[in-house]
């Protein structure tokens, strides 16, 4: 039986913003997001697409019209759960007390999550810090909307994927040119790994690094990697949030962030690749870029360690 796992706010943010041609939220078997707070709290605001968990005779009801056996991600949140441990709660009724004045009480999200683990094939995630922490960081993903029509989910515009929490995002050219996204994510610097240019970046010489390479296996990204890492580090020290982007946000920009993680953490291509793949499911650098990342690994670690002949790459 699958168990409970804690889900960091950045993980839920990335789950909500996965996309292929359309947002993954269009797939009814992709995400079941459940809010176990009170009705008035839910009505005041909740995370987009979240369903309110109802009670009858003081018992939680299962969500309607959701096949939990088929759902890939089942995420539950309350106000502020931050641990999977059972909490001690003061007991004011001396007659039922065991003498220490406290009872063992699971928080609402954990209590409901345990019920769901009997019905799912995948782990049930408890949002760490609950709604309070998530909405404090990603306020733009709050809503009062309760019912989402299929065409509304089709039209949902995902945000860039968060790679280094609060510091580095990866996206596409369209997202990079969207003023609302720049404002919501507090983007202050850009790394453009494409041939595309636009008026949005005019006059931004100190805040824009443009690596002009084609989307082809012959494109050479290796000569730019050291300068790119230096550019990102400078903006980290300045406290700037950085968006790395390419035309589709799948190949060149992902190769760039993998290279940065290898440099920043002094780690293998394999480890950096796995981390970015977990954050951004449709990541797919072309074979030419993968070969250059192996060369970059040799530069960073003194040897080529990752086997890029593995089908993973």
UniProtKB/Swiss-Prot annotation:
GO molecular function, a single term: phosphatase inhibitor activity
Domain of life: Eukaryota
PROSITE patterns per UniProt: TYR_PHOSPHATASE_DUAL (PS50054)
Keyword entries, A-Z: Mitochondrion
Keyword Acetylation: no
Major localization listed first in the record, in broad terms: mitochondrion
Chain ranges of the Rhodanese domain: 27-138
Segments forming a coiled coil: none
CDD domains: DSP_STYXL1
Keyword match Mitochondrion: yes
Subunit and partners: Interacts with G3BP1. Interacts with PTPMT1; the interaction inhibits PTPMT1 catalytic activity.
Protein name: Serine/threonine/tyrosine-interacting-like protein 1
Name of the encoding gene: STYXL1
